[in-house]
């Protein structure tokens, strides 16, 4: 049964778990999650993070759209110390779809502006900038630039080809890699 997460207290969550006969451990003291952390020159204001999830809402050129920006601004307002951006393609032919984000020379300023907005939202709402991480991506055999399958592979793999076919013409050069 699916339902929205509407619980306001830990007690409500525990009661629901009992109702469903789900045995989960719960920590009464979660203060460690609020502790800052410094790792190799990066300051993380707390131990909370947003996992990457593709919105598939870029512009045709791969720039962050208003929907992309709004999603990440909202995540910054939520207070997580780390926001891990969704898969961002590094080359046009490596995009999983026409709506996957693409970072290149032409789009770089749009990403810079989005980063500034996200950081500003974090500072305004919580007093700190979240650490932003980019998940760089090449979709390989699942590439669909222009929303048409165009697999690119380093080598043949019989097992993977049962899911998405790719013949020798799809093999990229060592220079491409």
Model region roles, listed by residue range:
Residues 82-109, 136-148:
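Glycine-rich, proline-tolerant flexible connector loops at the mouths of alpha/beta enzymes
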Residues 1-40, 55-63:
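An N-cap/entry alpha-helix motif that binds or orients negatively charged groups
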């Amino acid at each position: 049964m699916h339902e929205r997460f509407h619980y306001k207290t830990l007690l409500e969550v525990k009661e629901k778990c009992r109702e469903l006969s789900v045995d989960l451990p719960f920590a009464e003291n979660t203060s460690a999650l609020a502790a800052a952390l410094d790792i190799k020159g990066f300051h993380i204001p707390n131990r909370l993070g947003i996992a990457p999830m593709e919105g598939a809402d870029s512009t045709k050129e791969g720039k962050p759209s208003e929907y992309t920006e709004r999603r990440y601004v909202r995540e910054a307002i939520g207070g997580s110390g780390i926001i891990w951006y969704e898969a961002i393609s590094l080359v046009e032919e490596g995009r999983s779809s026409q709506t996957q984000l693409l970072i290149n020379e032409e789009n770089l300023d749009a990403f810079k502006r989005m980063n500034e907005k996200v950081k500003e939202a974090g500072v305004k709402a919580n007093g700190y900038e979240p650490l932003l991480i980019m998940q760089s991506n090449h979709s390989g055999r699942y590439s669909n630039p222009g929303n048409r399958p165009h697999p690119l592979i380093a080598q043949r793999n019989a097992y993977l080809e049962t899911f998405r076919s790719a013949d020798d013409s799809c093999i990229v050069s060592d220079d491409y890699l």
